[in-house]
Amino acid sequence: MKLLRNHVFWTVLSVFFACSQLQAGTLVLSSKFVNDNKDRATITVQLEVDEHLTHAHKIDKGGDDGDVHMAGRADEVRLPLVAEILNAAKETSSMQVLNQSSPASKIAVKGVWRLWFEHPSPNQMIQGNTVAKPINSNPDHVFEIHPITQFGNNSVVDSFVPIANKTTHYTAYPAATAFPKYEALKSTIKNNGSAISITSTKAGYNYAEFIIELAAKPTAVSDGFLVLAKIFDVSDEEEPVVSDLRRMVFVKGTPPSDALNGLGKGDHLHVMGIPRVNLTEVLAAAKAGKTVNTRLPYEMIIVAVFPE
């Protein structure tokens, strides 16, 4: 009976949002998932790894970011997903586990949940629909576990440092380039009570380098810290690149979280971060039964702090 109710729920959901405007991509999430994860940094899943790279990307700029991609399926997410290890070449034990894995096996994975419309499907992505087995390591998706913090029995929190190898340092996007792009993203949000639809223009600019000025003392959550901050380009710490405050996400036990310890209002950090959809703001913007057109709410996952 429970399976029947779930099938009916997701069928009704598909019909309800069938007429949603398709721009670059439309994602439909269960309201429970949004409420459960909106103020969390991470998610834990049993990941069936279907496709993966066998070695890390080279390090340069843009997509040459030193990550390793894997695509798979997880009952906890029920969406096409890609998981990524930061500074993967340094995580030799995790790379060994990945390369020895078989598609039939599942690996316990914990990491930062991330929704971002960089690689959306042309079709609606409805949480709970059957997820097709991916045919490569970077299929159409908007859900990621990125960066991973635990891969099998291996902790990889030490990967949350500037991306580099012995000869090369990664060049992230300057704040003056990336943040105007984030701010320009448009979205349509619709809430029917049991599910929330987000339609967004296509996004990009994965890694940005910037200065943050904390607007308050960080708030502790179960798996990290959240804090509002002003955002500056490294070349100009006088004029913020965004007129409003934006939320920063720090993962407990990582070097960025350690660097945050003891800081408060007015303190600065030189960081690298990646954007994700801010589900707290999505929920606040959503009006039951109404369509809301707004900028795409986003926040920044802090993946590294640069030494001063």
Give the predicted meaning of each segment.
Residues 1-11:
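Bacterial N-terminal signal peptides that target proteins for export
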Residues 3, 22-24:
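Intrinsic disorder/low-complexity segments enriched in polar/small residues
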Residues 10-20:
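Bacterial N-terminal signal peptides
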Residues 25-308:
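OB-fold and OB-like single-stranded nucleic-acid-recognition modules
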